């Protein structure tokens, strides 16, 4: 039920953010992320009823923590070196985890952070990618009955908060220096990993 409430909100937030970051994305990266993510969504659609969501939370959370630690301890580690193959792999995982547990952001970060983009291109690319991912998810979510009218009413009630969040993030990004911005992204990724493990265990 929570997933059905979140998805319409995320889409509205994505449309709001894409207006603010219009044409700030990098097409060569988007062309890798979107097709692979759609494959992951399709795989999730047909396997979700056989999947243990808590196990996925624990695995994604653990990888998130390891990724952040390795990134800070060994920045030149070959495991972090970005390649197109890693892009397709992590993007497909992102589509899968986004469909199942609304946690597509960590796997996308495993690919995008090592690319060392500037913060505007990073946000613009991420925004367009997740706009498409979330819109595509509408079809399978409707198919499995997660887009119930009662869920949509709750989503509408939370709309003002969604708009405020997007605007706050936009203006905050403009004030934060590049290095600090990405340090915050790494910290949030680490905390997200801890939260996923906690949710998976509890």
Which residue ranges define each predicted feature?
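Small-residue-rich hydrophobic segments that form or flank transmembrane alpha-helices
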Residues: 1-31, 90-95, 105-159, 163-166
């Amino acid at each position: 039920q929570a997933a059905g409430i979140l998805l319409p909100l995320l889409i509205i937030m994505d449309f709001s953010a894409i207006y603010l970051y219009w044409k700030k994305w990098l097409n060569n990266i988007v062309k890798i992320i979107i097709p692979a993510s759609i494959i992951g969504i399709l795989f999730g659609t047909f396997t979700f009823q056989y999947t243990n969501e808590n196990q996925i939370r624990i695995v994604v959370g653990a990888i998130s923590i390891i990724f952040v630690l390795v990134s800070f301890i060994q920045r030149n580690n070959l495991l972090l070196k970005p390649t197109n193959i890693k892009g397709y792999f992590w993007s497909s995982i992102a589509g899968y985890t986004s469909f199942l547990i609304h946690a597509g952001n960590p796997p996308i970060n495993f690919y995008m952070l090592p690319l060392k983009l500037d913060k505007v291109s990073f946000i613009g690319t991420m925004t367009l990618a997740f706009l498409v991912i979330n819109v595509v998810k509408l079809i399978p979510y409707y198919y499995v009955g997660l887009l119930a009218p009662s869920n949509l009413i709750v989503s509408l009630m939370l709309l003002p908060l969604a708009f405020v969040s997007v605007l706050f993030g936009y203006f905050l990004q403009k004030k934060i220096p590049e290095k600090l911005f990405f340090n915050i992204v790494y910290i949030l990724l680490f905390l997200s990993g801890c939260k996923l493990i906690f949710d998976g265990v509890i």
